[in-house]
């Protein structure tokens, strides 16, 4: 596996651990719809949380969250709409959707994790 793929996988594992510590229930990881992949789908109370994980080895070229581009946001919206339709019987009618980013960067020998809630709006 390429080094950047290993870093991305590690970042997703760290993000999932972080979310679980914050009492999120992980519903899916790497959920794919057509050409879109959602890194983590989680639930906290009546909120379906769509999490994009961005991991960087350094901040030399910008913060991890700066690399979530409009095209990716559009793909996430399509994917989460499909996911809700697919799992609609599993959710309460008043389920809310929130899009978060978990930004991770290497900080020496450890990793810094920043959880950005409501990172962008879907409607």
Swiss-Prot record:
S-S bridge residues: none
InterPro entries on file: Restrct_endonuc-II-like, tRNA_endonuc-like_dom_sf, UPF0102_YraN-like
GO molecular function per UniProt: nucleic acid binding
PANTHER family with a match to the protein in the record: UPF0102 PROTEIN YRAN
NCBIfam families linked to this entry: PRK12497.1-3
HAMAP family xrefs: UPF0102
Family that this chain belongs to: Belongs to the UPF0102 family.
Protein name: UPF0102 protein Fjoh_1217
Species this chain originates from: Flavobacterium johnsoniae (strain ATCC 17061 / DSM 2064 / JCM 8514 / BCRC 14874 / CCUG 350202 / NBRC 14942 / NCIMB 11054 / UW101) (Cytophaga johnsonae)
């Amino acid at each position: 596996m390429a080094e950047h793929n290993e870093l991305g996988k590690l970042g997703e594992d760290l993000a999932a651990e972080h979310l679980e510590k914050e009492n999120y229930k992980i519903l899916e990881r790497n959920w794919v719809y057509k050409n879109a992949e959602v890194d983590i789908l989680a639930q906290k109370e009546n909120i379906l949380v769509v999490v994009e994980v961005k991991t960087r080895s350094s901040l030399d070229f910008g913060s991890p969250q700066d690399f979530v581009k409009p095209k990716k946001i559009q793909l996430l919206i399509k994917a989460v709409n499909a996911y809700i339709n697919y799992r609609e019987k599993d959710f309460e009618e008043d389920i809310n959707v929130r899009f978060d980013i978990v930004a991770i960067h290497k900080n020496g020998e450890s990793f810094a994790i920043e959880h950005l809630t409501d990172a962008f709006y879907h409607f």
